[in-house]
């Protein structure tokens, strides 16, 4: 391990872009298949790992949704969330905001209550066991209707105190953010924080970024590297101090060899970049430390810049000022020890 890799490993981190359904590693997938008596096309962990290959967003979602079918019971959601938080804590993640997609489950007849109770229990147990604080962000699925998103928002209300924000994810094609404008407006009125995926090199991505910022008024952009294609959008993001939850390895899959240098351009432009792992189980188990290492090499990040990226994450987190100051003080103490 190099000095910079050791530095990255020990950095106190926050993760703001992580899909819980995207943390279904091969071992747990096989376990759930046996537990729930749902046969897989694969018969071994090695074969499952081999199946985690894709070349674009559509082929990724096909594999992703296959894994979702195995999640049936509260304990399944508990195991999924607890496993991620244990792994994150081992990589010095002290705070995490975790996306979950209830529509992927309710459309299969799984109740919202089953999903959320498993996640809440895992969140609380992980805090007790690993001292990692985490919160949940509920995402709407772009391919599904506005009406279904509205129903999902209504279903979330009994658990509003357990959900910090609302996001939008999945396939962008023909599913712009503006499609969900009214449900986002209502979510804001209810007190939810707002974010939105604007994925790398998808059709009309810069239009989607503009809609997310100007029409919906999100507080963060998930991915969002294509903002570099529009100087006016860059100006708007800088004026509003919009954080970008960038995911180096998933970007590398979509845009090989070029995604990491664009992180360098974003930083040099003054944009508020954070580094995250997205769907690590489906991306060669590149969790946050591996994503930091990839970005560091590809964007030639210094230790000072790595600390600033971590600082960006804590500043962008949807937490109390008391917690934010606590995390920033710990980060500053860590950085000072390396000066």
UniProtKB/Swiss-Prot annotation:
Q: Which residues form a coiled coil?
A: none
Which of UniProt's keywords are assigned here?
A: Cytoplasm, Hydrolase, Metal-binding, Nucleus, Zinc
Which Gene3D superfamilies does the annotation name?
Metal-dependent hydrolases
Q: Which GO terms describe its cellular component?
A: cytosol; nucleus
Q: Give the record's cofactor note, including how many are bound.
A: Binds 1 zinc ion per subunit.
Q: Do the record's keywords include Glycoprotein?
A: no
Q: What is its EC number?
A: 3.5.4.-
Look up keyword Hydrolase and say if it applies: yes
Q: What is this protein called?
A: Uncharacterized deaminase C1683.02
Q: Which organism is it from?
A: Schizosaccharomyces pombe (strain 972 / ATCC 24843)
């Amino acid at each position: 391990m190099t000095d910079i890799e050791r530095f990255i490993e020990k950095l106190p981190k926050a993760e703001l872009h992580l899909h819980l359904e995207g943390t279904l590693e091969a071992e747990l997938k096989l376990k759930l298949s046996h537990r729930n008596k749902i046969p897989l096309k694969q018969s071994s962990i090695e074969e499952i790992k081999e199946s985690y290959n894709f070349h674009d967003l559509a082929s990724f979602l096909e594999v992703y949704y296959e894994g979702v079918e195995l999640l049936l019971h509260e304990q399944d959601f508990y195991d999924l969330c607890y496993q991620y938080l244990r792994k994150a804590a081992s990589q010095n993640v002290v705070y995490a905001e975790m996306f979950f997609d209830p529509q992927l489950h309710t459309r299969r007849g799984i109740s919202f209550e089953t999903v959320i109770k498993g996640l809440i229990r895992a969140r609380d147990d992980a805090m007790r066991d690993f001292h990692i604080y985490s919160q949940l962000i509920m995402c709407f699925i772009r391919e599904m209707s506005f009406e279904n998103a509205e129903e999902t928002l209504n279903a979330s209300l009994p658990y509003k105190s357990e959900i910090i924000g609302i996001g939008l994810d999945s396939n962008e094609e023909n599913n712009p953010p503006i499609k969900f404008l009214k449900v986002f407006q209502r979510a804001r009125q209810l007190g939810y924080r707002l974010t939105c995926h604007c994925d790398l090199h998808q059709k009309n991505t810069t239009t989607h970024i503009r809609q997310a910022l100007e029409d919906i008024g999100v507080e963060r952009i998930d991915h969002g590297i294509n903002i570099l294609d529009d100087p006016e959008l860059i100006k708007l993001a800088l004026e509003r101090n919009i954080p970008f939850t960038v995911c180096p390895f998933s970007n590398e899959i979509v845009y090989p060899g070029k995604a990491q240098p664009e992180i360098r351009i974003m930083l040099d432009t003054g944009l508020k970049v954070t580094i995250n792992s997205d769907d690590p189980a489906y991306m060669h188990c590149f969790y946050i430390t591996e994503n930091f290492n990839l970005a560091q090499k590809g964007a030639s990040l210094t230790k000072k810049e790595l600390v600033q990226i971590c600082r960006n994450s804590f500043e962008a987190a949807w937490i109390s000022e008391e917690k934010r100051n606590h995390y920033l003080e710990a980060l500053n103490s860590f950085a000072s020890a390396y000066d």
